[in-house]
């Protein structure tokens, strides 16, 4: 079971003060425990790709992070650049203000810009930032992500005060059905919480506590 859950973990280090040494350590841990990916900021993608060369651990990065308030064109460029540097998964933040303004067409275009830039070269996960949304907005965001061709919907950046909840994961799974994966992220620090998220429908876990989860401990960081 430990190895099964390891394959669902995006081993994450997104804090702005992360050093190269810490990124290398993250990659070493990912190789040791067999995590699905490492998730790092775009500036560290080349480093992670170098460290993980020849392994099946994928490099994941973030787009429009953490606010989601850049333009579709900017997010598309970030995506192309990240893939050129070695990323094989991208976690993008939706335009939250546009969603709340009822500008669904813009939200969909924003997601589609990243999906088209990834063009089958990288998985696209769409962060809806559940802590800032009503349930109706969460459903609408997930529907737009699926419509735009995203591979996953994801709960949180970990930078907006609230992380994944079992209720949100279940709602997102109900909304997307089998059309997309669901990634629970933010505040998942131990085995019990990770298991609860998976039971609610999560198929990927984003956490900086991956080692603690698979070794039975409890991590301290939010993300």
From Swiss-Prot:
**What does the record give as its pathway?**
Carbohydrate degradation; 2-deoxy-D-ribose 1-phosphate degradation; D-glyceraldehyde 3-phosphate and acetaldehyde from 2-deoxy-alpha-D-ribose 1-phosphate: step 2/2
Q: Where in the cell is it found?
A: Cytoplasm
- Which UniProt key words apply to this protein? Cytoplasm, Lyase, Schiff base
Organism superkingdom: Bacteria
Question: Per the UniProt record, which EC number(s) apply here?
Answer: 4.1.2.4
Enzyme class of the recorded protein, top EC level: lyase
The protein in question is named Deoxyribose-phosphate aldolase
In its UniProt entry, the species of origin is given as: Geobacillus kaustophilus (strain HTA426)
- List the top taxonomic levels of the source: Bacteria, Bacillati, Bacillota, Bacilli, Bacillales
- Gene behind this chain? deoC
């Amino acid at each position: 079971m430990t190895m099964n859950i390891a394959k669902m973990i995006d081993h994450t280090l997104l804090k702005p003060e992360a050093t190269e040494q810490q990124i290398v350590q993250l990659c070493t841990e990912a190789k040791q425990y067999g995590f699905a990916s490492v998730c790092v900021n775009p500036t560290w993608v080349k480093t992670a790709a170098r460290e993980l060369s020849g392994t099946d651990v994928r490099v994941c990065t973030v787009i429009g992070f953490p606010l989601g308030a850049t333009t579709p064109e900017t997010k598309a460029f970030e995506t192309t650049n990240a893939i050129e540097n070695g990323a094989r998964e991208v976690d993008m933040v939706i335009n939250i203000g546009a969603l709340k303004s009822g500008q669904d067409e813009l939200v969909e275009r924003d997601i589609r810009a990243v999906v088209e830039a990834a063009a089958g070269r990288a998985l696209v996960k769409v962060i809806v930032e559940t802590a800032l949304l009503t349930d109706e907005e969460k459903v609408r965001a997930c529907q737009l992500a699926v419509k735009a061709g995203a591979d996953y919907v994801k709960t949180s950046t970990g930078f907006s005060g609230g992380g994944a909840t079992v209720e949100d994961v279940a709602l997102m799974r109900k909304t997307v059905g089998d059309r997309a994966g669901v990634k629970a992220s933010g505040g998942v620090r131990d085995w019990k919480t990770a298991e609860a998220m998976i039971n609610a429908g999560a198929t990927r876990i984003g956490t900086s506590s991956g080692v603690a989860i698979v070794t039975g401990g409890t991590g301290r960081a939010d993300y």
